[in-house]
Amino acid sequence: MKEIKVIIAGPRGRMGHEAVLLMERTEHFNLVAAVDYKHGGEKISDLPGMPALDTPIYADLHTCLEEVEADVLLDLTTPEVGKQHVTLAVERGLRSVIGTTGFTEEELKQLTETAKEKAVGTIIAPNFAIGAVLMMKFSQMAAKYFQDVEVIELHHDQKLDAPSGTAVKTVELIRQNRESKQQGHPNEVEQLKGARGANVDGIHIHSVRLPGLIAHQEVMFGGDGQMLTVRHDSFNRASFMSGVKLSIETVMNLDHLVYGLENIID
């Protein structure tokens, strides 16, 4: 396979660290630069626990793009920074794979239009774990037969957004096969505000944040005399790397924006 030159934004994070290791062990990936506002001017090898790579680190993406030629930006930063990075990448005609979440419908619409106008491949993935993508697809299928559903997503206590992008995407897919329906008693009253979680067309989403967790989600469907639970667990961040690899390889052949890995797997 032809070499793919990659820039990683956010190499110090746990996902970023796994992505650097992925670059090192994948023959056709070439990590040409990284972006980290705290370590501009250093090298990947200068960061604790990193492999001995001479890859330069830039303090900001704009400067990096002025000095480095790349094929793909892999962004694993925070929601706000990720939004800035993907906007800049699309405007510059650089393909990007975005692992941050928190995009609004309007932001996604604008990015989709710009990516189409520039004919630049972009993938925004709420979850890179193939198992999580299958969980979402299975939940979408089940929604045809079970109209009563609630979502419980559980993540580590350092996660910045709630609900998770995976939960939001799951509900979006379920809604495609389910008419709006209020789940629970029509006259129910929350004795404590928020006790029933977020409500999207009658689908309740509950967010749990605790140390010891990584990324987990249960989609619970209820019916007369039965329940169906679809669950996925990521026990470490290595579980996301197969999806990262697939996304980087796939985005090279795209000329538009794709939201969600379920749209690129068979």
Curated annotation (Swiss-Prot):
Annotated Pfam families: DapB_C (PF05173), DapB_N (PF01113)
One Gene Ontology molecular-function label: NADP binding
Q: Which residues are listed as membrane-spanning? A: none
What positions does UniProt annotate as the active site of this protein? Answer: 155, 159
Pathway it works in: Amino-acid biosynthesis; L-lysine biosynthesis via DAP pathway; (S)-tetrahydrodipicolinate from L-aspartate: step 4/4
Q: Which domain of life is it from?
A: Bacteria
Q: Which residues bind (S)-2,3,4,5-tetrahydrodipicolinate?
A: 156, 165-166
Which residues pair up as cystines?
Answer: none
Provide a GO CC annotation, any one.
cytosol
| Function, as annotated | Catalyzes the conversion of 4-hydroxy-tetrahydrodipicolinate (HTPA) to tetrahydrodipicolinate.
User: Sorted alphabetically, which NCBIfam families does this protein's record hold?
Assistant: dapB
Q: Which family does it belong to?
A: Belongs to the DapB family.
This chain belongs to the protein called 4-hydroxy-tetrahydrodipicolinate reductase
Question: Organism source for this protein?
Answer: Bacillus cereus (strain ATCC 10987 / NRS 248)
